Amino acid sequence: MGRKRLITDSYPVVKRREGPAGHSKGELAPELGEEPQPRDEEEAELELLRQFDLAWQYGPCTGITRLQRWCRAKQMGLEPPPEVWQVLKTHPGDPRFQCSLWHLYPL
């Protein structure tokens, strides 16, 4: 009986070259629960508004502005975050802040 064949007998071994710094892999993924920090205050405010858009406990957000949705949730006693109202009042004419995450999608 012959010797047991290995997979490397059929396929050549290919060694990969490492990158210029000696590392062949990229950055490690962030730890669970660790969220990337926003670049600046405006980006942090937009992220707060995106999270408000994704929170369904305040009702649907299609077809109305974020301020209208916030006021409707307040009237219904759903206690929307006051930080959202403050951000919306500081940027009254900016559609990036006033329109919801879904405003570009047709109904």
UniProtKB/Swiss-Prot annotation:
Expression triggers: In response to DNA damage, genotoxic stress and replication stress, following UV irradiation, ionizing radiation, treatment with methyl methanesulfonate, hydroxyurea, or with aphidicolin, protein expression drops to undetectable levels, due to proteasomal degradation. This down-regulation is ATR-dependent.
Impact noted for substituting K15R: No effect on ubiquitination. Loss of ubiquitination
UniProt biased composition (Basic and acidic residues): 15-28
Result for mutant: K25R: No effect on ubiquitination. Loss of ubiquitination
InterPro entries: DNA_pol_delta_4
Effect after changing K4Q: No effect on PCNA binding, nor on degradation after UV irradiation. No effect on PCNA binding, but normal degradation after UV irradiation
Consequence of substituting K74R: No effect on ubiquitination. Loss of ubiquitination
Record protein name field: DNA polymerase delta subunit 4
